[in-house]
Amino acid sequence: MTEPTQTQPAVTADENQIIAERREKLRALREQGVAYPNDFRPEHHAADLQAKFADSDKAALEANPVEVSVAGRMMLKRVMGKASFATVQDGSGQIQFFVTPNDVGADTYDAFKKWDLGDIVAARGVLFRTNKGELSVQCKELRLLSKALRPLPDKFHGLSDQEMRYRQRYVDLIVTPETRDTFRARTKTIASIRKFMDNADFMEVETPMLHPIPGGAAAKPFVTHHNALDMQMFLRIAPELYLKRLIVGGFERVFEINRNFRNEGVSPRHNPEFTMMEFYAAYTDYRWLMDFTEQLIRQAAIDALGTATIQYQGRELDLAKPFHRLTITQAIQKYAPDYTDGQLSDDAFLRTELKRFGVDVSQPAFLNAGIGALQLALFEETAEAQLWEPTFIIDYPVEVSPLARASDTVPGITERFELFMTGREIANGFSELNDPEDQAARFKKQVEQKDAGDEEAMFFDADYIRALEYGMPPTGGCGIGIDRLVMLLTDSPTIRDVLLFPHLRRED
C-alpha cells in the first residue's frame, strides 16, 4: 500500500471562487436530500484510540480487528487512484482515514473525491496500521455530515494575522493546536481551583451582575438602564460587597468565579470583561490568606500542567518555592536602592520623582494624596515590573484601601497584600474592614474624592453599612485574576490569548 505525504494542495483560485464552487456542491447535496444529516453518533475519539492502541502493531490489529466509529473535520486529503487518505480531526486529536471504492462503494468513493478540506465527515471501519506505522481507520462506511463553504487557512502559513485569530477564534481553534491547548489548560486551572476550594469547605455562590451601586473596587463601571424598574444599573466591577453580606448572613466560607466589567482601557493585561475568583473566609486574616493563596496557585499549576515549575516568555518560574514577602518601601529600595528612608517619607521629593517618571501628579487622584499613596505610585514606576518571582507586596496605605482593615500596630497602613509574578498583579487580598463606623467614614472620603473628579473612587453603599451593623466576624478576603493566572500557566504574552472571544474594535 502506498501512503501519501501529508501536504495540502495549493490554492489556485481566490476565496470567493472557492466559496462559489463549494456552494454549488452544497446545492447538489440539497437536491439529493443529504445536505446536513444528523443521524450519526460517533462512539470513539481520535486521541483515545491513539492512546489505547499505541502499542498495537500491524499484526496485532489484523489478528484482533477493532471496529470503530469516528467523526470530525477533514484537515488533509490525498486522492490516489483507487486508494485515498484523509486526516480527520475531532475534539480530542487526529486520526487517519483510509478510503477505497471496494470498502465504501464506488458511488461513495466518487463523492468523497469531491469533498473539501474543512468538511465534517464520519466513518465506521476497522483499525489497522499502514506500512509506515500510522494508526488508521479502514473505512467501511463513509459519510459527509456538514459541508464547509469557506476554505481553511493554508496549512503552512496558518492563521498568521493576529487580529484575525482573535476575531475568528473558531478558525484559530480549528487550525492551531496550541490555541486549543491553551483553553484546555484554562479549563483545568478553573477546575483545580474549584476542587481546592471545595476541599477547604468553601461554598460556591452566585451574586448579582447588575448592581444599583458599583462597589468593591476602584474602577469605572459600565452603565445601563433597567426598564421595568426604571432605574440606572451598573455592570458589576467586583462581587466583594455582596460576598461579604453572605459572611454577615452566616456563610463562613464563600467563593465566586465569574465575570467583572470595567469600562477602562484595553492592553496586553486588561480586557473590559474579565474573569475573577473572589473568596472570603471568616475568622482569618491577610497572613492566612497569603498562605492559602500560595497553596492554591501552586496546586492549580500542578493540576493544569503537571508541574509547579513553569516557563514564561523564556524564563523559568518556580512556584514550588516559598513566595517572597516585601512591604512597598522594601520593594522600592530593593529595585531602586539609592532611595533613602527619608526621601521615601518626603511628600515634595516623592512628587518630584513621580513627575520625573512622567506621572501627572496634578490629576484628582493625587491632589490630596498622602505619603502612602505617593509611595505606592513610586513603587509602580520602579519596582512592580521587576517582580518576576512570586512576591506578596504587603501593608498598603489606608487611603488606597477603603475596604481593608487598618493595622493595629502601624498607623496609616492596612492588613493588605497584592501578589505579583512576572511583573504583573495576580491577586489582591486583605483582612476585611468589619467596623461599620470606620467603613462609613472611608466611604465618605471616597465620595469626596469622586466629587473632586476621581472617576474610580467608590460610591457610598448604605445597605452594605447596614449589613456590617448586624456584625461581621473577623474575615479575610482575596481576589485572583483568572485570566492573568492562565496567561502565566500557558506562557501567553497577552490577555487576548486566554480569552476565547476578546473585545476588538468593530470590523470595517
Swiss-Prot record:
Gene Ontology biological-process annotations: lysyl-tRNA aminoacylation
UniProt GO cellular component terms: cytosol
UniProt EC number: 6.1.1.6
Catalytic activity, as annotated: tRNA(Lys) + L-lysine + ATP = L-lysyl-tRNA(Lys) + AMP + diphosphate
Cross-referenced CDD domains: LysRS_core (cd00775), LysRS_N (cd04322)
Keywords: Aminoacyl-tRNA synthetase, ATP-binding, Cytoplasm, Ligase, Magnesium, Metal-binding, Nucleotide-binding, Protein biosynthesis
Signal peptide: none
Binding-site positions, Mg(2+) 2: 425
Annotated positions binding Mg(2+) 1: 418, 425
An example molecular function term from Gene Ontology annotations: magnesium ion binding
Superkingdom per UniProt: Bacteria
Compartment list: Cytoplasm
Family classification: Belongs to the class-II aminoacyl-tRNA synthetase family.
Quaternary data: Homodimer.
Protein name as annotated: Lysine--tRNA ligase
Encoding gene per record: lysS
